[in-house]
């Protein structure tokens, strides 16, 4: 087992020392000298622990201690030693006769450190604060700016002008694209500056035929941007893009295939209504060809419903 702390013993006094206690320890040391500090309290008649007696003698009661303030030479020596070896107060105190390590440490923390900070010197590295800031900038990469020539006002203006020129060219290209697009004309002299968007339904339940139709129409409008159609294109029908399965096979198939066909037809009707609503709300009167295409889809839809009434009578829309 380890030795318990001496201050934990029973009936041991703690706190400030009195003049009577100081006189007892001084008298004992004057007669017997410094020896085993754990036995001195009992022999001197002190109700103190050995550690407390040793610290009291070393830091306050020794006859060679100096109790006056530190001189200028002592302060300079403390600063030089601290610059060389750091906070090794015992080693610094050995160079100062009559001073304890506790005295040196307290004087450094209360006086000398603040004095150096007021002089613009870092108390840890003993370097000027301005030099430390410069080194920090070099380490962090900010100091490279001092080795670079600052751009003149003319170069800044040139960069800003080039940026504005790029933005102007981009805007002009967009306007020319929407101007020449066949989907944007209402007549030969008026056009919209905002593009027309077909919004797809959130539930993608249709076949790939709708995407192929839209991709073919978009590729036509992109490859021929300068051609303005005078009449709507009606040389194709939306039924040409359906699946290539023959109609009798669909009619004679099982109930599962009939249900799939009717579901596709139902969702296609929803998609057509959704597209027509978007056309009416966002591009009313501005896309004649698109509206005619949707009208063609709706007409063919009604024609299919009239041709296959036996497939759609059992479902409510």
UniProtKB/Swiss-Prot annotation:
Gene3D superfamilies, per the entry: Homeodomain-like (1.10.10.60)
Keywords on record: Developmental protein, DNA-binding, Nucleus, Repeat, Transcription, Transcription regulation
Localization, UniProt: Nucleus
Cellular component annotations (GO), alphabetically ordered: nucleus
A family per Pfam: Myb_DNA-binding
InterPro entries, per the entry: Homeodomain-like_sf, Myb_dom, Myb_TF_plants, SANT/Myb
Consequence of gene loss (knockout): Male-sterile mutant, defective in tapetal development, characterized by irregular and excessive division, redundant cells and leading to dysfunction of the tapetum. Impaired callose dissolution resulting in altered microspores release from the tetrads and no pollen production.
SUPFAM superfamilies in alphabetical order: Homeodomain-like
Main location (coarse class): nucleus
Domain HTH myb-type stretches: 9-65, 66-116
Signal peptide: none
Residues of the DNA-binding region: 37-61, 89-112
Tissue-wise expression: Inflorescences-specific. Accumulates in anthers, especially in tapetum and meiocytes/microsporocytes and microspores during anther development.
GO biological process: anther wall tapetum development; callose localization; microgametogenesis
GO molecular function, one term: DNA binding
Stated role: Required for anther development and early tapetal function during microspore maturation. Regulates callose dissolution required for microspores release from the tetrads.
Protein name: Transcription factor MYB35
Gene (name only): MYB35
């Amino acid at each position: 087992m380890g030795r318990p702390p001496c201050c934990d013993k029973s009936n041991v006094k703690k706190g400030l020392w009195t003049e009577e206690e100081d006189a007892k320890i001084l008298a004992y040391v004057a007669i017997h000298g410094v020896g085993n500090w754990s036995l001195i309290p009992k022999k001197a008649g002190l109700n103190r622990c050995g550690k407390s007696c040793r610290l009291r003698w070393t830091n306050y009661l020794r006859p060679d201690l100096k109790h006056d303030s530190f001189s200028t030479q002592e302060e300079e020596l403390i600063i030089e030693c601290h610059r060389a070896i750091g906070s090794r107060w015992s080693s610094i105190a050995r160079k100062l006769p009559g001073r304890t390590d506790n005295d040196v440490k307290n004087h450094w923390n209360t006086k000398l450190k603040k004095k150096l900070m007021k002089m613009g010197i870092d108390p840890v590295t003993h370097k000027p604060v301005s030099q430390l800031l410069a080194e920090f900038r070099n380490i962090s990469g900010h100091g490279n700016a001092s080795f670079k020539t600052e751009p003149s006002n003319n170069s800044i203006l040139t960069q800003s002008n080039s940026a504005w020129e790029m933005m102007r060219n981009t805007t002009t290209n967009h306007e020319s694209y929407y101007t020449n697009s066949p989907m944007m004309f209402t007549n030969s002299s008026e056009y919209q500056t905002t593009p027309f968007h077909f919004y797809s339904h959130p539930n993608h339940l249709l076949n790939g035929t709708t995407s192929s139709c839209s991709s073919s129409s978009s590729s036509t409008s992109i490859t021929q941007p300068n051609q303005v159609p005078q009449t709507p294109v009606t040389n194709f029908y939306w039924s040409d893009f359906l699946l290539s399965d023959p109609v009798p096979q669909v009619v004679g198939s099982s109930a599962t295939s009939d249900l799939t066909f009717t579901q596709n037809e139902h969702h296609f009707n929803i998609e057509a209504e959704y597209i027509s609503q978007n056309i009416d709300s966002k591009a009313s009167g501005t896309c004649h060809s698109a509206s005619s295409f949707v009208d063609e889809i709706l007409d063919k839809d009604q024609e299919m419903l009239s041709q296959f009434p036996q497939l759609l009578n059992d479902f409510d829309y």
